[in-house]
């Protein structure tokens, strides 16, 4: 997903996939803090913010223990407020259902504690979010079904796309729309 986003000009954070046996020297040059998370979990399971190299190995072990596939994503930390975007696509046409402001515990685990929907965004920012997410859905060739996109918006209004799941959001986001 991240490779597709980068190739298509969608704004993902820099990230590296760590599989069992990967030489961790591939992470040299990444800027701290880092986010370490399993590739295949939801609900913030196994996510850790790492401030320094000495804590990296333990975070990778923790994420791998939470992963079904035993694969871990290490990404550069993205500043900004976190949002999720719920969409439904039918025959390649995307429909924005809601943008949700997310509240979390913050570092180091980022466990969600609450939501506000609709998110208090200007019409201009809402359109910018819609445009970024729809382009990313096209990048992933999503034609039919629900999607749950996660992104961050910094103070300058820049959007970084974290990920897209082919499902509705959890924590009652979909049912409370």
Feature roles, as predicted:
Residues 1-73, 79, 90-92, 115, ...:
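Active-site nucleotide/adenylate-binding loops and adjacent lid/helix of ATP-dependent enzymes
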Residues 63-71, 76-120, 127-161, 165-173:
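Phosphate-binding core of ATP-grasp and ATP-grasp-like enzymes
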């Amino acid at each position: 997903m991240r490779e597709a986003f980068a190739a298509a000009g969608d704004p993902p954070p820099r990230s590296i996939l760590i599989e069992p046996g990967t030489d961790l020297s591939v992470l040299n040059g990444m800027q701290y803090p880092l986010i370490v998370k399993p590739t295949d979990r939801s609900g913030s399971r196994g996510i850790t913010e790492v401030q320094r190299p000495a804590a990296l190995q333990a975070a990778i072990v923790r994420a791998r223990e939470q992963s079904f596939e035993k694969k871990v994503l290490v990404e550069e930390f993205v500043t900004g407020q976190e949002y999720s975007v719920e969409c439904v696509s039918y025959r390649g046409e995307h429909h924005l259902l809601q943008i949700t402001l997310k509240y979390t515990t913050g570092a180091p685990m980022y466990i969600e504690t609450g939501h506000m929907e609709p998110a208090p965004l200007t019409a201009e920012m809402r359109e910018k979010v819609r445009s970024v997410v729809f382009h990313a859905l096209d990048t992933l060739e999503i034609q039919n079904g629900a999607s749950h996109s996660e992104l961050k918006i910094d103070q300058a209004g820049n959007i970084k796309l974290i990920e897209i799941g082919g499902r509705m959001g959890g924590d009652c986001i979909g049912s409370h729309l």
